[in-house]
Amino acid sequence: MLTDHFRPQSFNGIDDIVIVGGGLAGLFCALKLAPRPVTILAAAPIGYGASSAWAQGGIAAAMSKGDTFEKHVADTVAAGAGIVDEKMTRMMVAEGPARIHDLLEFGVPFDRDLEGKLLLSREAAHSERRIVRVKGDMAGKSIMEALIAAVRNTPSIRVIEGYVVEELVREGRFISGVIARPDAGQSKSRVSFPARAVVLCSGGVGHLYAVTTNPWEACGQGVGMAARAGAIIADPEFVQFHPTAIDIGKDPAPLATEALRGDGATLINSEGRRFMLDIHPDGELAPRDIVSRGVFAEVQAGRGAFLDCTKAVGRHFPEMFPTVYASCMAAGIDPVRQPIPVTPAVHYHMGGVLTDGEGRTSIDGLWAAGEVTSTGVHGANRLASNSLLEAVVFAARIAENIKGSLPAPKLTAWGDNAGENDDPVTVEDSPPFKVLRQLMSDCVGVVRTRESLTRAIRGIAELERTNKRLRFANIATTAKLIAIAALQRTESRGGHFRADCPDERPEWRRRTYLTLAQAERLAAEVAESEPA
């Protein structure tokens, strides 16, 4: 599907800038690049395949009278478990308020009080109320609706929907374009898009796992593509599990937003006991990794875990949290009167393609923003509502960097050019992908061990050996990077927990940097070793 103002066949000539992905980072970057000509390639209609549109909490920004940049930085560093890049974090936090004002100018209807001031809420591990929201739990949807309208009204932005990017084209040290498959990845032909600059905004890795809150499109293709092109990947072992996905057997799992606990909702087991009080002094508002392990332990013990909102929210649930309310009622659960069954689900990837403060990757010609990246601002455990902030801050910085480093083209030509052919694959329906998802959940999940990680690496290698299609190779590459980095990190920190190494170790108070070549060598060593 294409925007109304452009109907291409296939493409020739050179695009000025190609953005891969139609989520928050991609759309915001395109808008900040205007009037530079930009082509957005999106696997699904923009907004529909993006985790951004599903975000319920909001965007964190230090804007209230009692808040400061220093407090926001301190909270981010504390949540990140010792490996946050403080310089990058200070930059992100300082630019947050300006990006909120950009979003207001693009038409985002953030909640306001009777005097017109922005309403700010508090979420887990934040010391102040600094989350800007829309209608309680509709921030992501409302932000994306506003940006989509702005993009479709910007003549310099061309949106091509239903094109799945499968490969970054590298010529020497440079990325010179991308190759994509039309018809939502189902076409037998592929199309090349040469470009002067490529911005990767392809999202996260949630659907590498059997239980996730992410849309189907978030299956790790972007990280795998970049790694296969030679990019450095950082911190891939750090996967954040949201502790309160609604446990009703849906895929993806609906999310019970962090804001519910911020407003006083409690976590109980089937015996009615608030188990988080025994685990952390902040109880339900402890960092996500700690709450996730607490919920996981109750579920594994057979006691179950439930989010009790009956007293904290009660009859105000429908208007305060309409998205969560609708998900519960559709499953026959009335959250006004009943506790909500919850389970940990993959929600966010702190790791990804390594970028600097301008969004540049380790390969010339390739920038990246959003969840596909690892900027260092999240460390080992992302602070709630910092992800949308990171997306807009670094998307804007990429736009400024490209404007300053690439002179505007005099002419952009479009024509016909059929790409290389290959057999398409519907990733979400393929048996190998289902096997991979279960393998990752079982062996590289909330709790990991040397034995489970070794089993995962061997299982991934077998799946790669028997499945040669390019899209699967990208996805399996990302899974392998996560598992290898998790095996190498012989400690527990943030979103990475090893039952056989349950404590933090000072020698591991550092980030992980990994190339695909290094991961392949380590995987070969695992394959040759004795079974764990």
UniProtKB/Swiss-Prot annotation:
InterPro entries: FAD-dep_OxRdtase_2_FAD-bd (IPR003953), FAD/NAD-bd_sf (IPR036188), Fum_R/Succ_DH_flav-like_C_sf (IPR037099), Fum_Rdtase/Succ_DH_flav-like_C (IPR015939), NadB (IPR005288), Succ_DH/fumarate_Rdtase_cat_sf (IPR027477). Keywords: Cytoplasm, FAD, Flavoprotein, Nucleotide-binding, Oxidoreductase, Pyridine nucleotide biosynthesis. FAD binds at residues 22-25, 51-58, 371, 387-388. Catalyzes the oxidation of L-aspartate to iminoaspartate, the first step in the de novo biosynthesis of NAD(+). This is L-aspartate oxidase. It catalyses: L-aspartate + O2 = iminosuccinate + H2O2. It comes from Rhizobium meliloti (strain 1021) (Ensifer meliloti). Pathway: Cofactor biosynthesis; NAD(+) biosynthesis; iminoaspartate from L-aspartate (oxidase route): step 1/1.
